[in-house]
Amino acid sequence: MSRLKKLYTEEIRKTLQDKFQYENVMQIPVLKKIVISMGLAEAAKDKNLFQSHLEELAVISGQKPLVTRAKNSIAGFKLREGQGIGAKVTLRGIRMYDFMDRFCNIVSPRIRDFRGFSCKGDGRGCYSLGLDDQQIFPEVDLDRVKRSQGMNITWVTTAQTDAECLTLLECMGLRFKKAQ
């Protein structure tokens, strides 16, 4: 069992139960999945660059990314239908908890001038953030990076409100800015 999964079952569930006074244990929020996505529209013109970003995403996440393709052709953007324009990975289970543990304890402190993430969720129990650079992940070989590439990370939970979601993620180790 993952260290973070064990922490969730032994401590975090009790903390959430005490704070939000759930009537049923099934109401306690759970982390369902983590989605990591990259928009690679500029890199789509260069196949080697596109492939290197796919490899970096695979190394970061631990599984092969799914290439997202264009639905329509748009001449103004020089985009053809079926052309690869991005990549995404959906993490569940043990890989999800391992990624969350690494992200909170290793990656977040490596972000320059890091003072915490924004406290704004989507209002339905999900939290998303954007990173400007993939080089903060220790798995990425800096000598092989051809171009800096950002990514979006979304945490999907069973929480009903932002407060529940942010409390769950904060208990798991994600650091947020203090409210002023």
Curated annotation (Swiss-Prot):
Q: Which domain of life is it from?
A: Bacteria
Return one Gene Ontology term, BP aspect: translation
Question: TM segments?
Answer: none
Entries under InterPro entries matching the protein: Ribosomal_uL5, Ribosomal_uL5_bac-type, Ribosomal_uL5_C, Ribosomal_uL5_CS, Ribosomal_uL5_dom_sf, Ribosomal_uL5_N
Q: Does the keyword Amino-acid biosynthesis apply?
A: no
Q: Which UniProt keywords are listed?
A: Ribonucleoprotein, Ribosomal protein, RNA-binding, rRNA-binding, tRNA-binding
Report one GO cellular component: ribonucleoprotein complex
- What residue range is the signal peptide? none
Gene Ontology terms, MF aspect: rRNA binding; structural constituent of ribosome; tRNA binding
What is stated as this protein's family in its record?
A: Belongs to the universal ribosomal protein uL5 family.
Q: How does it assemble?
A: Part of the 50S ribosomal subunit; part of the 5S rRNA/L5/L18/L25 subcomplex. Contacts the 5S rRNA and the P site tRNA. Forms a bridge to the 30S subunit in the 70S ribosome.
Task: Tell me, in a sentence or two, what this protein's role is.
Answer: This is one of the proteins that bind and probably mediate the attachment of the 5S RNA into the large ribosomal subunit, where it forms part of the central protuberance. In the 70S ribosome it contacts protein S13 of the 30S subunit (bridge B1b), connecting the 2 subunits; this bridge is implicated in subunit movement. Contacts the P site tRNA; the 5S rRNA and some of its associated proteins might help stabilize positioning of ribosome-bound tRNAs.
Protein known as: Large ribosomal subunit protein uL5
Species this protein is from: Chlamydia muridarum (strain MoPn / Nigg)
Which gene underlies this protein? rplE
